[in-house]
Regions:
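Macrodomain-like recognition of ADP-ribose-binding/processing modules
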Residues: 1-231
Length: 231
């Protein structure tokens, strides 16, 4: 199979994000990281991330809505994973862990279900930064096992019903994802699309990006994108 060039990936991504507004574009060593405002369910990619709970039950927030969009086959797949893990006295998917499934009715090839810290619980809130890093590392490890994975679509972890502080969370999102795309080892991902529908999170993301743009890995390409220099 012919390998897609980075430019091919960018052109394909422009077709995948028609239902969302591109807010930030940053070029890293291995590809672009974009922040989008819109509905993640309508954004196509190779790998899509679901912000799961530890039961893989899909009963609240974005997790529930994404599972509903994927259909009953996904719920059955999650139930089977939970059943098998409980045989070994394990949670279906603990905090800082990830499992993978087919995408079923969602516009992707595969899904990664990741459990972030639930800041409504003091025992997790007190260690939220470390737990958040663990969650992203679990996500990155899971992505490495999947093909294709050129385009990764994800919500910012912990920012939905789990009530992670948005300003801190926005900074951590960039401080974790940008170095991953800019490190020496190629993750095999050409495009990361961070999709949010939360106005407060987006405003905090814009603020921390403006404040720290010159200190983040990579080069800002937002202005070039808005001028139509690339799609």
């Amino acid at each position: 199979m012919q390998k897609l060039s980075t430019m091919d990936t960018y052109q394909m991504a422009s077709l995948r994000i028609l239902m969302a507004e591109v807010v930030i574009v940053r070029e890293c060593r291995h590809g672009q990281v974009r922040v989008l405002y819109g509905d993640i369910v309508g954004v196509e990619g190779d790998v899509m991330v679901i912000p799961a709970n530890s039961r893989l039950a899909g009963r609240e927030g974005l997790d529930e809505r994404m599972q509903q969009a994927a259909g009953e086959d996904l719920r059955e797949a999650c139930a089977n994973i939970a059943k098998e893990r409980r045989k070994s006295n394990l949670q279906p998917c603990g905090v800082g862990e990830a499992v993978t499934t087919p995408a079923f009715g969602l516009p992707a090839s595969n899904l990664v279900h990741v459990v972030g810290p639930d800041c409504r619980r003091p025992t997790q809130d007190n260690f939220r930064r470390e737990l958040m890093k663990n969650s992203y590392n679990a996500l990155f490890d899971a992505v490495k096992t999947l093909e294709p994975r050129k385009t990764l679509v994800l919500p910012p972890l912990g920012m939905d019903v789990y009530a992670y502080p948005h300003r801190e969370g926005a900074r951590m999102t960039m401080e974790i994802i940008l170095p991953w795309m800019d490190r020496e080892e190629d993750p095999g991902v050409d495009m990361v699309l961070i999709v949010t529908h939360e106005d407060n999170f987006l405003n905090n993301m814009k603020t921390i990006y403006r404040e720290s743009e010159d200190r983040f890995p990579g080069v800002d390409r937002t202005r070039d994108y808005r001028k139509g220099k690339f799609q």
